[in-house]
């Protein structure tokens, strides 16, 4: 049995900007200066290593904790089972995530079947951004200039899951 999940950190917003709006991540680690996530080099963006594992609780058996940090966006995450998976998934931020459900096979002639998919309080949106070959957009893949177009050089090696730089997404210098 193998479990894995990949994710990509595009940076966190400075809590001083959005703190009064109630948009702070409830599971973020508060650093000495109140930043979300582990602090990079005096930057309000963390690398996400302090995020707690998300607990998927199946109806029988133990929990399926998943915790991940990666510089490469996932192409898919699949769970296949003949059982019912229930539980709560808490996610904060803008994630490259699309959920789909497929029902295959022979269904019982008696009983009921249901597929329920929701996104918490309904405050969600589909966001699509092109990673054009412009320095300010290329940094999400560990190359180019600083995050959010700050025009500061960064270091990146996506295959190694390492990202550093001033105001970047890494556990910077």
Curated annotation (Swiss-Prot):
Disulphide bridges, residue numbers: none
Coiled-coil zones: none
Keyword Cell cycle: no
GO BP: chorion-containing eggshell formation
First and last residue of the signal peptide: 1-7
GO CC terms: egg chorion
UniProt keyword list: Repeat, Signal
UniProt xrefs under Pfam families: Chorion_1
Top-rank taxon, per record: Eukaryota
GO MF annotations in UniProt: structural constituent of egg chorion
Family: Belongs to the chorion protein family.
Function, in words: This protein is one of many from the eggshell of the gypsy moth.
The protein's name: Chorion class B protein Ld32
Organism: Lymantria dispar
């Amino acid at each position: 049995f193998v479990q894995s999940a990949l994710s990509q950190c595009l940076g966190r917003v400075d809590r001083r900007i959005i703190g009064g709006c109630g948009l702070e991540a409830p599971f973020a680690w508060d650093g000495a200066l109140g930043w979300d996530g582990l602090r990079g080099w005096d930057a309000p963006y963390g690398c996400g290593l302090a995020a707690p594992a998300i607990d998927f609780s199946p109806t029988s058996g133990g929990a399926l904790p998943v915790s991940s940090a990666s510089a490469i966006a996932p192409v898919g995450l699949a769970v296949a089972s003949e059982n019912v998976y229930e539980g709560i998934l808490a996610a904060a931020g803008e994630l490259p995530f699309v959920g789909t459900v497929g029902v295959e096979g022979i269904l019982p002639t008696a009983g009921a079947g249901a597929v329920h998919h929701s996104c918490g309080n309904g405050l969600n949106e589909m966001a699509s951004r092109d990673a054009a070959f412009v320095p300010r957009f290329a940094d999400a893949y560990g190359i180019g200039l600083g995050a959010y177009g700050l025009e500061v050089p960064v270091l990146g090696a996506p295959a190694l899951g390492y990202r550093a730089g001033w105001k970047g997404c890494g556990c910077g210098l």
